[in-house]
Amino acid sequence: MIDTAGLRIMRAISEQGSFTAAAHSLGYTQPAISQMVRRLEGRIGTPLVERQGRTVRLTQAGQVLARHAVTVLSLLDTCLLYTSDAAD
């Protein structure tokens, strides 16, 4: 199963273009991002990034996941907003 942290990481890597920048934007360390990506790749069973020196490039599978991550995270935020409003 993919958790929201994994989705947020893939979205950040897609937007930032590197593990270091993604880590900075999310408040993680670069090694933590690397470890989370490896774990996510293991769960999915396919590479999500191609490492090229200090930059990374999303594979086709990584691009698909990052694109859907944006949608899923937006829907989750909307759901939480409506749930909070309903509780008031």
Q: Residue spans of the language-model regions?
A:
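A short, exposed helix-loop element centered on a Lys and neighboring polar residues
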Residues: D77-L80
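A short LG(V/I)-centered, amphipathic sequence patch enriched
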Residues: E41-L58
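Conserved small/polar residues in nucleotide/adenosyl-binding loops
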Residues: Y82-D88
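Short, solvent-exposed amphipathic helices
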Residues: A61-L75
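Short helix-boundary/capping micro-motifs
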Residues: A12-G27
